[in-house]
Amino acid sequence: MWCITSQKNGMSALGLQRVLGLGSYRTAWLMLHKLRQAMVRPGREKLCGQVEVDETYWGSAEFGGATGRKTLSKVLMIVAAEADGKRIGRIRMALIEDFDRKTLHRFIQDNIEPGSTVCTDGLNSYRELNDYIHNRKVQNLRQGGEPLLPRVHLVISLLKRWLLGTLQGSASDKYLDDYLNEFVFRFNRRKSASRGKLFYRLAQQAVNAEPATYSMLTSRRI
């Protein structure tokens, strides 16, 4: 656990296998995924204040695949980033099946406090956020101006860089939610004074996490 939390960007299963001298890649892989599942704390506080929300893809589109929101060959994600002045506060991420109104509204309700200001792009699925102050932004690219939703777009960029860098592009779509858990855990604790605090927090959450076996993890469906 210390090997994982002491590294700023984490490590891949192959890296953990080498560091610990494990004879089996499967053992390192299982250890990492158990810990990634423990990185989500039940009952964690929702985001609040001003929160930017946007959707993105992971998969074939990253390598020049087909484009367009309704292409289902890609893994769909939604990301929320809390504003902390001009900086980024806490974040949340989730895999989603589609960009329909019901799906996007459920993510917002599960992760953002009612009464918060939710900033989105012009996608119609975001309309009628009745429990929130909705700041819907549509940009005319010909007119230029400041980029829309800068915080959440930066978070999305950092996530993709992390998936391609630390994990060397090996993040399987089947387990992508576990990788999102780790990224959120690390990002939300990036200001911790010491790596020891991350270790303590993860150990605390791992003790209370539901058990996960190799067969449970590998029997998942995408």
Give residue spans per PLM region.
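Residue-level recognition of single "structural anchor" positions
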Residues: 1-222
